[in-house]
Design a protein with these regions (language model features):
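SAM cofactor-binding core of SAM-dependent methyltransferases
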Residues: 96-161
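Short active-site oxyanion
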Residues: 94-98, 117-118, 216-220, 273-279
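SAM-dependent nucleic-acid methyltransferase catalytic core
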Residues: 51-86, 135-255, 275, 286
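Short His-Asn-centered micro-motif
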Residues: 100-102, 122-123, 222-224, 243-245, ...
């Protein structure tokens, strides 16, 4: 937020609103400095998730997401929901349709359904797409199949991982995906190692209840290349695109086979998304991506990530001019 445009009285009001102390007797520039410092330190709690919120002026407190993803997902945005939703409400209010070309774990997308949005989700990774469509169409059977396979062992983990790309039965694919996701170190399907701690603490009855509670009634799913997906959805005044592409360099899980697809073409996707008017893209912060989007607005953000929520992720949110 640009505090320089506000009067000293308005700045004092903001200090009182956001609990900023030490402003009494200060000059305007000093008060702005206090507000900027508070912006960096401000945190929001969503359940067990602590979110660093860098923009007081766009702060939205989310006390419950209500519709929570059952998946652990590398680079997932569970802890960024408050920040992302603040950018949506500030820059793209009243949107009714959200397009997600990289649905992934779906944390933000599912949150947006609680705000009245219809979500069209897409993911190129077949097992993940299969998990979501199976959860949507036959969640009770999926939950029962997972229970039958519990508990997970290291040997079973290895067997499921080796067979998931060859399996043709959708229910078996979805079951395997969920079990691998809940018991790998990072939530990655094909590149995260087995974690006994995760197997004991994250593949539980409560995780299955979380799966059953997931409401996908306002979501549709497709299994397309991201550019093709956007081409299938012409822009309307009600539509917003939220894209969370694979990180530049560390592109671990994008692709129909979930391979290490360093071949994802970030430049092509940038060209595709910039043809539209209303969109938000989140990326890891690096010079290459900044150069691709140099004709756009770029905001630096940080949110916590990892199993202990103590690491900070340096990311950027990109919006059209």
């Amino acid at each position: 937020m640009d505090y320089s445009t506000k009067t000293k009285e308005e700045l004092i009001t903001l200090c009182k609103k956001y609990g900023v102390k030490g402003y009494s007797g200060k000059k305007k520039a000093e008060i702005i400095s206090l507000l900027n410092k508070k912006s960096i330190e401000e945190t929001t709690v969503i359940g067990e998730h602590i979110i660093v919120n860098p923009v007081i002026g766009e702060h939205i407190t989310v006390t419950s997401t209500k519709n929570v993803s059952p998946l652990r997902y590398p680079g997932g945005k569970t802890r960024a929901i408050s920040i992302l939703s603040s950018y949506v409400s500030t820059h793209f209010p009243n949107k009714k349709v959200l397009l997600s070309p990289f649905f992934g774990g779906g944390s933000f997308e599912l949150f947006m359904t609680t705000k009245g949005c219809t979500v069209h989700g897409n993911d190129l990774f077949v097992p993940l797409y299969t998990f979501w469509t199976t959860t949507q169409s036959d969640c009770d059977t999926l939950a029962a199949a997972i229970k039958e396979q519990m508990p997970m062992t290291k040997e079973k983990f290895r067997t499921l991982r080796e067979s998931i790309l060859q399996e043709n039965d959708s229910m078996k694919v979805a079951t395997s995906y969920f079990m691998i996701n809940r018991t790998s170190f990072s939530g990655a399907t094909l590149c995260g190692g087995y974690s006994q701690q995760a197997a004991e603490g994250r593949l539980t009855e409560s995780s299955i209840e979380k799966l059953k509670a997931c409401n996908l009634s306002a979501v549709t799913f497709t299994n397309l290349d991201a550019n093709a997906f956007l081409d299938c959805h012409p822009e309307t005044t009600d539509t917003l695109v939220y894209a969370d592409p694979p990180y530049y360099i560390d592109t671990y899980i994008y692709g129909k086979n979930g391979d290490m697809h360093e071949n994802f073409n970030h430049a092509t996707f940038a060209d595709t998304i910039k043809k539209r008017s209303d969109w938000i893209v989140s990326y890891n912060d690096c010079k290459y991506i900044r150069d691709l989007y140099k004709d756009c607005r770029i905001f630096e953000v940080k949110w916590s990530y990892g199993m202990n929520a103590k690491k900070a992720s340096s990311e950027i949110i990109i919006l059209p001019l």
